[in-house]
């Protein structure tokens, strides 16, 4: 938990646009790593980190932007759950890769 608090403190030092850039970079990582069957743990970790980023930063945006971030957070949680049962399906991973770029 201490490490998570350090990460949160460090993350919140960045400006909101920089934080959104970090989130966008994570979505790109999800897209890239999802193409490979042996990267489940990496993708899961990046999804979890992205959900935390949203949790920590959504309140710094107006209500409509925050709602979009929360919508993305829910999508990330859904992908995480689905990945546990469908990761071995290449077609699902490729769909995840495509969807995470949008």
Task: Please provide the spans of the model-predicted regions.
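Surface-exposed peri-terminal alpha-helical interaction modules
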Residues: 1-102
């Amino acid at each position: 938990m201490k490490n998570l608090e350090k990460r949160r403190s460090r993350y919140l030092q960045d400006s909101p646009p920089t934080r959104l850039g970090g989130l966008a970079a994570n979505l790109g990582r999800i897209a890239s790593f999802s193409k490979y069957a042996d990267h489940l743990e990496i993708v899961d970790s990046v999804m979890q980190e992205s959900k935390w980023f949203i949790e920590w930063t959504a309140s710094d945006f107006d209500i409509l932007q925050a709602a979009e971030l929360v919508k993305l957070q829910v999508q990330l949680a859904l992908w995480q759950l689905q990945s546990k049962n469908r990761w071995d399906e290449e077609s699902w991973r490729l769909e995840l890769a495509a969807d995470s770029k949008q």
